[in-house]
Amino acid sequence: MARQREVLSRVVLTTLLAWSPVAPPQDRSSAEIVVQVSLTAGLRYHEAKAVWDRMRVGDALTLVREAANPYDGNAVRVDWNRHQLGYLPRTQNEAVARQMDRGNKLEARITKLTQYRNHRRKLEFEVFLPLTAR
């Protein structure tokens, strides 16, 4: 099932990136297509705890491609205001990594922040493709 979602995500992303509306700069308005929604992997191992209280739903995240990562050749790091939070999950990063390698500009933002009583945290975010339309 996870493999089917990964393949579907890759097909949808490739199709969307192939369709790129172009307009003169003065005629552009912002639009976007959400490519995937993910939980941050490795959240407890990085800086999330130190910045947790400052993060808000809607905050922009920075996706950083780590092609030389020794543990995962498709690694995509997730940062908030220059603080490393974790990674795009290994099971969901191939299509995003491939598009970043091709020079496509994908963006991300926080969609949900959850803290449990046992101090575990979950950060959900969406990866999206910014578009311009006439």
Predicted feature locations:
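Conserved active-site motif detector
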Residues: 2-134
